[in-house]
């Protein structure tokens, strides 16, 4: 009997790790995502992030290459751009880098953070990008479009969020272009009040991009036809993590990471307890 129980829980845990990797994606609150807003620890993170960035470079060659490319572009466009007090070269470089080739790999790591937090090598990049949007946000709301080649399914109950940083466009034509959308995908029509218009920072200004932080929550969700989803009433923010990589958040970090690995630990302990 203990052996059967062990097998059951091991199978259950493995299923949890792969659920959602195939077929339509669930539109929910993205519980596995890394969604830190760094509330109360910005000064600490500004001190620590440069060191974290070097650590990330050592473990993530793609990020290092993308960062160096973005840094060159940022230095070229910086003199002709306006930005608020507190916005520095790190913030600008991160924002430019996101519009390049790194976004797909970065967002995958953000979405799957809870499954493997030890392999998250975008610590500083996540902070700088989050902070860039916070500094550039002026409270304006935008009506935007996002086309995907992946089908999303909404159960019809509850608020939702993307969890990851989400690119959208002021242009429906851009969102529905073959580069981003297919007949088997989903077209999102979104009202965002935390998203920031980043055309002036982008490698692709023709995309008319509005970048939405993953912690924006939409309280009204409506589906239309086969592949359109409307997201409205973005009045709340939700994060499961805060100041995870700052010394100010050391206690919270331990608790959060313990909760992340708890299911696998329970499975292993159960198996070891067999006679």
Curated annotation (Swiss-Prot):
Postthymic T-cells. Has both NAD(+) glycohydrolase and ADP-ribosyltransferase activity (to a lesser extent). It is found in: Cell membrane. It comes from the Eukaryota. PANTHER family: ADP-RIBOSYLTRANSFERASE (PTHR10339), T-CELL ECTO-ADP-RIBOSYLTRANSFERASE 1-RELATED (PTHR10339:SF24). Its EC number is 2.4.2.31, 3.2.2.5. Transmembrane segments: none annotated. It comes from Rattus norvegicus. A lipid is attached at residue 246 (GPI-anchor amidated serine). GO terms for cellular component: plasma membrane; side of membrane. The keyword Chloroplast does not apply. NAD(+) binds at residues 98, 146, 164, 202. Residues 61-238 form the TR mART core domain. Disulfide bonds join 41-243, 141-193. This is T-cell ecto-ADP-ribosyltransferase 2. Residues 247-275 form a propeptide. Its main location: membrane. Keywords: ADP-ribosylation, Cell membrane, Disulfide bond, Glycoprotein, Glycosyltransferase, GPI-anchor, Hydrolase, Lipoprotein, Membrane, NAD, NADP, Nucleotidyltransferase, Signal, Transferase. One of its GO terms (molecular function) is nucleotidyltransferase activity. One of its GO terms (biological process) is NAD catabolic process.
């Amino acid at each position: 009997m203990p052996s059967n129980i062990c097998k059951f829980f091991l199978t259950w845990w493995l299923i949890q790790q792969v659920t959602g990797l195939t077929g339509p994606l669930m539109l929910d609150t993205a519980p596995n995502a890394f969604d830190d807003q760094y509330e109360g620890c910005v000064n600490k993170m500004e001190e620590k992030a440069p060191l974290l960035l070097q650590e990330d470079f050592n473990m993530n060659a793609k990020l290092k290459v993308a960062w160096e490319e973005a840094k060159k572009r940022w230095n070229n466009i910086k003199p002709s751009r306006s930005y608020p007090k507190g916005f520095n070269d790190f913030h600008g470089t991160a924002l430019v880098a996101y519009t390049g080739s790194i976004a797909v790999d970065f967002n995958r790591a953000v979405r799957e953070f809870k499954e493997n937090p030890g392999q998250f090598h975008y610590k500083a990049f996540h902070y700088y990008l989050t902070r860039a949007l916070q500094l550039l946000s002026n409270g304006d709301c935008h009506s935007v479009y996002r086309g995907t080649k992946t089908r999303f399914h909404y159960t019809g109950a509850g608020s939702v969020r993307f969890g990851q940083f989400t690119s959208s466009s002021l242009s429906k034509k851009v969102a529905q272009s073959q580069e981003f959308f297919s007949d088997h995908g989903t077209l999102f029509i979104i009202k965002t009040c935390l998203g920031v218009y980043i055309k002036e920072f982008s490698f692709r200004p023709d995309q008319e991009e509005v970048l939405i932080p993953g912690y924006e929550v939409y309280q009204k969700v409506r589906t239309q036809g086969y592949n359109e989803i409307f997201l409205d009433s973005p009045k709340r923010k939700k994060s499961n993590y805060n100041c995870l990589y700052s010394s100010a958040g050391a206690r919270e970090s331990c608790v959060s990471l313990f909760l992340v690995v708890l299911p696998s630990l329970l499975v292993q302990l159960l198996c070891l307890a067999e006679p």
